[in-house]
From Swiss-Prot:
Organism name: Influenza A virus (strain A/USA:Huston/AA/1945 H1N1)
GO cellular component: host cell cytoplasm; host cell nucleus
PTM characteristics: Upon interferon induction, ISGylated via host HERC5; this results in the impairment of NS1 interaction with RNA targets due to its inability to form homodimers and to interact with host EIF2AK2/PKR.
BP GO terms, sorted: symbiont-mediated suppression of host cytoplasmic pattern recognition receptor signaling pathway via inhibition of RIG-I activity; symbiont-mediated suppression of host gene expression; symbiont-mediated suppression of host mRNA processing; symbiont-mediated suppression of host PKR/eIFalpha signaling; symbiont-mediated suppression of host type I interferon-mediated signaling pathway
UniProt gene name: NS
Entry's family note: Belongs to the influenza A viruses NS1 family.
Protein name in UniProt: Non-structural protein 1
Region (Disordered): 205-230
Length: 230
C-alpha cells in the first residue's frame, strides 16, 4: 500500500475530527455541515477499502499535523496562507456564454448528488467541448459555478449546475457529474472533450485528446446511467 495514501487518509481523519468539534460547538454554517456529512461517508468508504481503523488513523493524523505545525515558522505559515487560501475564480466561458438561454429538442435531466445535469439527446455526431466557470483553492477545483457543453458551432447542448436546495459539493461530485454528461453525449456518437483549464484543476492532469482520466468507479456510474437512459 502506498504510504502517502495511508498518511493522507490519517490526516483527513484528524481534520474531519477538528471540523466535527467545530460543528458540535454550533460554529458551522449549512454548507460546512453538508460537507462534513459527505466527508464522513467518504472516510468510512476509504477506511473500509484501505482496511484502516478510523479512530487509530485519527490519532496518527493528529501526530502528523502537530509535527508539521511545530516545524512551521510563523513567517512561513503566513506566506503559505497568503498564497494558498486565496480562492481564485477561473472562467472558460464569457458572460454571454454563461447567461445565454438555450433549448432542448429531446431534454434529459438527471440529479447527481448536489448537481443537476441537463442534456439534449437529439444532438448526434457532433464535436463537443465542455467549458466551466469555477473557483479554485489549493490548486484544485473548489466550487463549480456553471458548466456547459458547446458544439463547434457554439450551440449549447448540455449543462451541469449546482442545486440551490443542496448547497455544497465536492471535487468528486463534479467529476462524477462530468462523467455522466460525457457518457450521455457520447451515446449518440458525439465526440466530447474537456477544456484544459477544467482538466487541470478537476483532475490535475491534461490529455491532448481532452478526455479526463475517469476512475473505474466513475466509468461504472457512467455506464449505469447510459443503460438507464436507453
Amino acid at each position: 500500500m502506498d504510504p502517502n495514501t495511508v498518511s493522507s487518509f490519517q490526516v483527513d481523519c484528524f481534520l474531519w475530527h477538528v471540523r466535527k468539534r467545530v460543528a458540535d460547538q454550533e460554529l458551522g454554517d449549512a454548507p460546512f455541515l453538508d460537507r462534513l456529512r459527505r466527508d464522513q461517508k467518504s472516510l468510512r468508504g476509504r477506511g473500509s477499502t484501505l482496511g484502516l481503523n478510523i479512530e487509530t488513523a485519527t490519532r496518527v493524523g493528529k501526530q502528523i499535523v502537530e509535527r508539521i505545525l511545530k516545524e512551521e515558522s510563523d513567517e512561513a505559515l503566513k506566506m503559505t496562507m497568503a498564497s494558498a487560501l486565496a480562492s481564485r475564480y477561473l472562467t472558460d466561458m464569457t458572460i454571454e456564454e454563461m447567461s445565454r438561454d438555450w433549448f432542448m429538442l429531446m431534454p434529459k435531466q438527471k440529479v447527481a448528488g448536489p448537481l443537476c445535469i441537463r442534456m439534449d439527446q437529439a444532438i448526434m455526431d457532433k464535436s463537443i467541448i465542455l467549458k466551466a466557470n469555477f473557483s479554485v483553492i489549493f490548486g484544485r477545483l473548489e466550487t463549480l459555478i456553471l458548466l456547459r457543453a458547446f458544439t463547434e458551432e457554439g450551440a449549447i447542448v448540455g449543462e451541469i449546475s449546482p442545486l440551490p436546495s443542496l448547497p455544497g459539493h465536492t471535487n468528486e461530485d463534479v467529476k462524477n457529474a462530468i462523467g455522466v454528461l460525457i457518457g450521455g453525449l457520447e451515446w449518440n456518437d458525439n465526440t466530447v472533450r474537456v477544456s484544459k483549464t477544467l482538466q487541470r484543476f478537476a483532475w490535475r492532469s491534461s490529455n491532448e485528446n481532452g478526455r479526463p482520466p475517469l476512475t473505474p468507479k466513475q466509468k461504472r456510474k457512467m455506464a449505469r446511467t447510459i443503460r438507464s437512459e436507453v
